[in-house]
A protein has these predicted regions:
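Hydrophobic alpha-helical transmembrane segments of membrane proteins
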Residues: 1-74, 83-158
Length: 158
């Protein structure tokens, strides 16, 4: 278990080439849809867009995480040989990549929101993050890793 956790939680340079595009694609999609929603003056759509962007990032990271593990065989060999150990390692690795991508996506969206607010005050897309309470951000950053650790521990223990 210790070897699997250290293998999964280590932020390696190859992970960044996978996590950065996975994070920036939903950000660009969210920004374009937010600009389209802002032109139609639909405030309810602007509140839903951050959640849709986060869900899109998680799904994309799950798919790319499996592809990454299939192409990175040495990391896959560090997982337990049992079926439960492999599943736990896969869940932990995907959740780690998802957290990294969510942090990159949140930073990029806030930066794009600030740029949009400065240049296009009528289409203040950065204000769409205003609808999410402050306590949700730490939960979004920490909860996937904690769930992955607990899930990996339960699967390898029983």
């Amino acid at each position: 278990m210790k070897r699997m956790i250290s293998a999964c939680l280590r932020f390696e340079a190859p992970d960044l080439w996978l996590a950065v595009p996975a994070a920036l694609f939903p950000v660009l999609v969210s920004e374009v849809t937010a600009l389209m929603a802002a032109t139609e003056d639909d405030p309810e759509a602007l509140v839903l867009l951050p959640g849709v962007g986060m869900i899109l990032t998680v799904v994309l990271c799950c798919v790319l995480g499996v592809v990454y593990l299939c192409s990175n065989f040495p990391l896959l060999l560090q997982f337990s040989a049992s079926r439960r150990g492999s599943l736990a390692g896969l869940c932990l690795h995907i959740l780690r990549m998802t957290v990294l991508a969510e942090v990159i996506a949140a930073a990029a969206t806030m930066a794009l929101g600030a740029v949009n607010h400065g240049f296009f005050p009528r289409f203040a897309v950065g204000e769409l993050w205003r609808g999410i309470p402050v306590f949700v951000w730490p939960i979004c950053a920490v909860l996937p890793v904690l769930v992955g650790l607990v899930w990996a521990g339960v699967l390898t223990r029983f």
